[in-house]
């Protein structure tokens, strides 16, 4: 096995003594830093490379912290208007995963870069920490690389805001295989409409 394979096996056993100690030290270190900061290199190089990262010019890693749990609806004095169904304030859960939310926040802050992918690095009682792989599409090393220059096209601007990253597709229920039959046709709504609509074929 290569070195990256050993690193991958380490992260599969997060309850081992080594990983518990390592993650505890890391989350303490991350708590001292700002919630969004640039990382000089990926914390998990094996995972980053599998998601498309390469140690070359134009690739950037940013680390972000996201508060765990649900969100309280930001309404004054709990006054929500409308039907009782929409009166909830406290126990509301996000429709998307925290990883997708983390990608969105990084993408909004760093609008000149493109979000390629992201991965989990640590968590504690209050926060989850992710590293996001970003790409500088104006760098000549990226534009000349046929393996990655697809992301330079304008259609890939703000992929993270449209659910086109891996975490975003996971939140939308999109994938391949029998487990994802509920989104055949592009989305849950499209699949529902196709299954529940009666087709009246016109006889000619």
Swiss-Prot record:
InterPro entries according to UniProt: Rbsml_eL15_core_dom_sf, Ribosomal_eL15, Ribosomal_eL15_CS, Ribosomal_uL23/eL15/eS24_sf
MF terms (GO), sorted A to Z: RNA binding; structural constituent of ribosome
One BP annotation, GO: cytoplasmic translation
GO cellular component: cytosolic large ribosomal subunit; cytosolic ribosome
Compositionally biased residues, Basic residues: 190-204
Domain of life assignment: Eukaryota
Region span, Disordered: 185-204
Family per record: Belongs to the eukaryotic ribosomal protein eL15 family.
Protein name as catalogued: Large ribosomal subunit protein eL15
Organism from which the protein derives: Drosophila melanogaster
